[in-house]
């Protein structure tokens, strides 16, 4: 596994900023679904062709990698719904391009987790782009809670550290087997 784009971070930042933090995210993608990306196709593609998206896998991003203000300047005075739609489209296309470029098979299930798994508009766009070769499923179909995957991962990493078991991360981060973190025994 690897990071392929901004996920929800730019969408969430936009919604929080646009609503004076009244809302934390675009529930079900309702605002984005009202928007139009067609007038901004050039800006979306320009953003996706930036150096940021020219990576080799495995890859890891941080929220600091994605500059909402820079993208908003590219859009000019676009209506809020259009901005939300464009940000959602960047996330959707970054996932699509990562699968297209790096998935060794031409047919596989794609499991969504995190807040994006609950964003109906984002999921519908992914289904359209990926088609039937890559069916979209919510990770809850495997008995896992979408919002808790990252927390569960860090708990697992902590457990491995406490028992002194090295973790093999080469396929997901490129790192050599190692013990992560430090335990204060005081």
Model-predicted regions and their roles:
Residues 1-92, 173-186:
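Conserved ATP-utilizing enzyme core subdomain
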Residues 6-11, 87, 122, 147-150, ...:
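Catalytic-loop motifs flanking and including active-site residues across diverse enzymes
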Residues 134-136:
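Generic structural signal for residues in well-ordered beta-strands
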Residues 89, 140-186:
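Glycine-rich phosphate-binding/hydrolytic loop that grips phosphoryl groups
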Residues 11-14, 71, 95, 99, ...:
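Buried hydrophobic packing segments
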Residues 107-129:
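Glycine-rich phosphate-binding loops at beta-strand->alpha-helix junctions
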Residues 97-107:
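Phosphate/pyrophosphate-binding loops at sites that engage ATP/ADP/AMP, CoA/4′-phosphopantetheine
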